[in-house]
Amino acid sequence: IGAAGVAFNTAAAENSDLATSRSLILVTPDGQRTMNTYLGISTDFNRAEVDPAVIEASNYVYLEGYLFDRDEAKAAFRQAVDIANKAGRQVALTLSDSFCVDRHRKEFLELIRSGIAILFANESEILSLYECGSFDEAVVHVSRDTKLAVLTRSEKGSVVVSEGGPIPVAPDAVQKVVDTTG
């Protein structure tokens, strides 16, 4: 990952009672998956861990929606977005989970509209974000809120939403789905 130019400049946490994050993924014979994730020490993300120099030296800053639960983390997200925007950097956000979106819809929308350039979401997450009944309606909304959105739709493929409009991406033909963990 480092050879591809991706940096993970995070020191190991010290003096915490929380364990390392874990994810248990169960895959059924039809390839569908169920995840049970324990975020552990990741939930302690806060403003002290946001390094302006690292953000200013980056091309992209990637924010993981799962970490948005605590107020300290929300403040860190906002700080990172502010630093990145002032430095002319691109900020990407993944919505992570429709339940996460349900918990933080208003704040996610505020964050997205404040300077998220790239949004990653699946169909259920984007429908939850905009509280609408159709995927096409959600595409209209997201096109107003961010420069680029990449929306996955399982067996229906994906849709890339940019200033030029939505671009459908057909799924690859697969003989047998082994695992849908993405």
Where is each model-derived feature located?
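Structural recognition of alpha->loop->beta junctions
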Residues: 4-7, 106-128
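Short beta-strand/loop segments at the ligand-binding rim of alpha/beta enzyme cores
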Residues: 87-95
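A short, aliphatic-rich alpha-helical micro-motif
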Residues: 52-56, 112-113, 143
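Hydrophobic beta-strand scaffold residues
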Residues: 8, 91-92, 149
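Distinct, well-ordered alpha-helical segments
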Residues: 49, 75, 101-112
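Conserved N-terminal subdomain of the carbohydrate kinase-like
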Residues: 1-63
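Conserved phosphate-binding/catalytic region of the ribokinase-like
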Residues: 82-86, 106, 135-182
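Active-site beta-loop-alpha junctions enriched in small/polar residues
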Residues: 66, 96-98, 124, 154
